[in-house]
Amino acid sequence: MKEMTPRERLLAAIRFQGPDRVPVSPRLWRYMLAHGGTQKAHAYLKYAAEFDFDPLLSFGAGPVILFPRPQSDYSKLGPGIRVEETTREEGDCRIVTRTLHTPAGTLTDRTRIPRPGGQFGIAPNNHIEEYLLKGPEDLPALRQLVQAWTAAHPVGDIRSFIDEMGSRALVAANTYSALSHNAGDVYPLEAMMIDCFERRAFVEELIDVFHAPLMAATKAVCEQGVEMVFCSAFFESMSAGWSPQLYRELFLPRIRAQVELSHRYGALYHLYDDGKLAATLPMHREIGVDLVSTLTPPPTGDITLGQARQVAGNRMCLNGGIDTVNTIWRGTPASIDAAVREAIGAAATPEGGYILGTSDSITEETPPENFRAFFEAGRRHGLLKGR
């Protein structure tokens, strides 16, 4: 068989069309930030050239977070919205307090922002001390804020980036779900879970404030001819505390809508959930998801690659399954080799259906010999059984 390009190899694996070998495409952003100070695509391509792997890139042609986060540029929000923002330093953090005035009402929030590279790690998450939304009475103001933000940041050109990457990478349009860093960052998840039983209509309306612009952005990128839509949907994860029933009732219909929209334009759909997947993976197959990441193994996750393959059959490609902490960071080249061999044996089929990937980003603490061992093992064991 003629050697495939990275883009061809990834597409063949996702479509079960017989790649020349198992694609290798780990998440690298933490390692890249620590060792090079950037996670930009061109830096990723340099790693790919050195270590011979297959870049699976996501590109945001518009805002993936559909409302202004603290310390944003508010200048384009328009005359109807005014933001007052104060900051103060406290230890290794910055405390940002905001008052956002809209024609429909006033919203307030307070966020603790840790310093990147400090005691909380290379790229720490913000800690929200006061959420923007207090209850249903704030929905009109939130809706105006989201509409103003997305209008000020329309979907731009993704086609040029895809063409620039060419055969060197498979590029997906990057989106975040209506909940992930969107509704889940303006209203606490714990309160939302309780509200599902006490005032479901409020939760549905809150999610749809973000789902509508998400769908509009998805349509806009699909009209540019993207080959794949990538959606991070980890706030919905079983690991966040949701039940399978609530997932089916609340989130699955909205994910299905984005899947079906992508498919109408001929684009593949890639769903990202780095938590527990045993209960939701059958639902993803049910609605036609083409590729699922990251299949985090036990004990953090709750499904093995062998179990995931049984669920996915030959209709859904799997990406991930290698533990970045216990296997890659804290392991040895020999144990990494064994884990990669086992993963490919469990998840790959003669037609493809598996991308050798990681449970999340390879960590900044990973020894160089372990980093290199992962890619060498992928090449060593990547010839598909039966081919």
Region roles according to the model:
Residues M1-Q39, H101, L133-R387:
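Active-site loop segments of alpha/beta catalytic cores
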Residues E8, S25-L28, L57, I65, ...:
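Intrinsically disordered, low-complexity segments enriched in proline/serine/threonine
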Residues L28-W29, G60-G62, T99-A104:
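Short, flexible beta-strand-to-coil junctions
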Residues G37-P79:
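Segments that shape or occlude catalytic/ligand-binding pockets
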Residues T38-L45, T108-Q119, E369:
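Surface-exposed flexible segments
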Residues Y44, D92-V96, P154-D157:
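Generic hydrophobic, aliphatic-rich segments that mediate packing or membrane embedding
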Residues L57-G62, N126-E130, G386-R387:
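A generic structural motif
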Residues D73-L145, R168:
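A contiguous, low-structure linker/loop signature
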